[in-house]
Amino acid sequence: MKKYLATLVILLVSSFATVSAQTWGNPYSGNVKSASQQQASITFKNKSDYTMTLKIMKEYGGVYSTVVLSPRSSRTVSFSSTSSYKLKIKAVHNGIASYHDGGNFSVTCNEYEWTEGTMEFMLSTYGSGLGPRISAKEFESNY
């Protein structure tokens, strides 16, 4: 009986080790990640003296994530599936806010490819640089 239990334990341990070692991606390109690591990511960088709030909106409405960036800071957001998003930006400096349409972007995340990128934001006192202006009401809307 002890020999049977020891064999069963060894088989169970071996099967768990095999599952955790599975990889995804193209092994010929060198872009191979384990299943537990597979996520797309975008790093948002604020290269200005403004505090920025980024609302990442889902393609058909609803907030995916809200990111607050202090002046000259960055933050990485992870995505677990392929989708399209809309970006809304609120920039605040000396208590004065401006609101902007940051445009649309897409993220790819599947077993063969995934997005890893950077978006940088710069706002100067001489011009926008963040996209067309929108109203505060439009920024607050979740559509």
Protein language model features and the residues they cover:
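Sec-dependent N-terminal signal peptides
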Residues: 4-16
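Primarily secretory-pathway and cell-envelope proteins
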Residues: 21-60, 65, 90-143
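Mature, secreted membrane-active peptide modules
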Residues: 44, 80-82
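Short beta-strand segments within Ig-like beta-sandwich modules, predominantly Fibronectin type-III
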Residues: 65-71
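Tight coil/turn sites that cap or link beta-strands
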Residues: 71-72, 82
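Short strand-edge motifs at loop-to-beta-strand transitions and within beta-strands
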Residues: 73-77
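A short tyrosine-centered beta-strand micro-motif
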Residues: 84-87
